[in-house]
Amino acid sequence: MKSVRYLIGLFAFIACYYLLPISTRLLWQPDETRYAEISREMLASGDWIVPHLLGLRYFEKPIAGYWINSIGQWLFGANNFGVRAGVIFATLLTAALVTWFTLRLWRDKRLALLATVIYLSLFIVYAIGTYAVLDPFIAFWLVAGMCSFWLAMQAQAWKGKSAGFLLLGITCGMGVMTKGFLALAVPVLSVLPWVATQKRWKDLFIYGWLAVISCVLTVLPWGLAIAQREPDFWHYFFWVEHIQRFALDDAQHRAPFWYYVPVIIAGSLPWLGLLPGALYTGWKNRKHSATVYLLSWTIMPLLFFSVAKGKLPTYILSCFAPLAMLMAHYALLAAKNNPLALRINGWINIAFGVTGIIATFVVSPWGPMNTPVWQTFESYKVFCAWSIFSLWAFFGWYTLTNVEKTWPFAALCPLGLALLVGFSIPDRVMEGKHPQFFVEMTQESLQPSRYILTDSVGVAAGLAWSLQRDDIIMYRQTGELKYGLNYPDAKGRFVSGDEFANWLNQHRQEGIITLVLSVDRDEDINSLAIPPADAIDRQERLVLIQYRPK
């Protein structure tokens, strides 16, 4: 009966965090709107080989992540949940692997359940795992690779070893098809310390070629298909998206070596108090085969991405699966021997909640700021934010009431965040970051437009997805669409600022022309270098400018 109660509690936890509140959050630009529109166009066109964004070739990522996202929209429709269904599915599958792997390592059902709950409630896992980007997919394939390699190396017979390495190759191949060749580098770097300490080089060299073969065979069908359709895909994807993004001096998202230290700290909430002990205990027990394996899969990817010049918080998502297992193992030891770390964890959560309550007041309409984050008419959003942090502090306090037994309730600290964050976003943020909000406000003006131009790729993708059309034209800026716009068949999909007046004269009689521009909050739109408009509708950071036929 206790096992049944635990399962019911786990399903309720998943429903409250990963299912029920997802539709209440509008899509964020540029990431979510971009991937939503790519998958919508894939479904609309039936082209499952070449990814397109706004009808243009889009070679920044391979195809597998778009496949999963497209299936999500196909099953659940073109809505907020449908767009995020793929990443939620991948996150839950990763959690299932955490359960299985923990159970296999320690043969303890309670430990396996706790590791799963810790993983799903980690702030970084929840934030990225309910956000429509490709990182939850690559995290799943990397964790699957971690499990496959362990299976292979623990097998006694050649059949088991062969099957494990073949499975490892498939996971690496799917990782390559999701986000590229990093899916090969990370597993190799992660297993080397374990192989070295356990002196298992012989098995690696004898069976490793099976992983190489299955990886190549996994990628080959689509790799050949896109090479035939778009011969320059692999050149662009390898040199620009890998070498330039991660290694060169002009890499995207440049950040210092220590960039991931605050990411690890914030991402470990509400279990931050367990982080030092989990890592220290893992290192102290490094002679234990399973512990050093998990520690290696936590530390090595972190070091790899720290050395790379281009950095984003999402890159290290896969590190938190083995870290959650180490945390759960350490937490049970602490509860049994010395619960100091569990008490510290409770106080950290109380401090975080109280700090959030105070910060919310400071930026509220009743605080000391001259330009508050929320306006007076958004009072209910302030109370939602207070509720988020109040619940965080409350469950932090509750874990201290009988810490040896109540410490797992720290998993409920982000409950308010999960349920209420969609209702607490300030309008000033929504107007710039949620194109759906803008579309809702301007639907009647946008719908009959013959041409729609915008100066932001994220806004363009949001408009395209909301209006179910891929013919949005880029104005003044090309952004990440620069490469796709260079193709001859993309002529007419970009209008520069200098050309706009002439372009307008040529196309005005064809129907309503709508210009959607991103502007600064205090910018005077009358100073924009554009022809006089027939209608202007400003929604704070976004402004709709319309020209009607004369």
UniProtKB/Swiss-Prot annotation:
**InterPro entries with a match to the protein in the record:** ArnT_tfrase, Glyco_trans_39/83, LipidA_mod_glycosyltrf_83
The catalysed reaction is: 4-amino-4-deoxy-alpha-L-arabinopyranosyl di-trans,octa-cis-undecaprenyl phosphate + lipid IVA = lipid IIA + di-trans,octa-cis-undecaprenyl phosphate
Recorded GO cellular component terms are: plasma membrane
Major subcellular location class:
membrane
Purpose: Catalyzes the transfer of the L-Ara4N moiety of the glycolipid undecaprenyl phosphate-alpha-L-Ara4N to lipid A. The modified arabinose is attached to lipid A and is required for resistance to polymyxin and cationic antimicrobial peptides.
Specify the protein name: Undecaprenyl phosphate-alpha-4-amino-4-deoxy-L-arabinose arabinosyl transferase
Alphabetic keyword roster: Cell inner membrane, Cell membrane, Glycosyltransferase, Lipid A biosynthesis, Lipid biosynthesis, Lipid metabolism, Lipopolysaccharide biosynthesis, Membrane, Transferase, Transmembrane, Transmembrane helix
Its encoding gene is what? arnT
What family is reported?
A: Belongs to the glycosyltransferase 83 family.
What is the E.C. number? Answer: 2.4.2.43
Q: Which GO terms describe its molecular function?
A: 4-amino-4-deoxy-L-arabinose transferase activity; mannosyltransferase activity
Q: Which GO terms describe its biological process?
A: lipid A biosynthetic process; lipopolysaccharide biosynthetic process; protein O-linked glycosylation; response to iron(III) ion
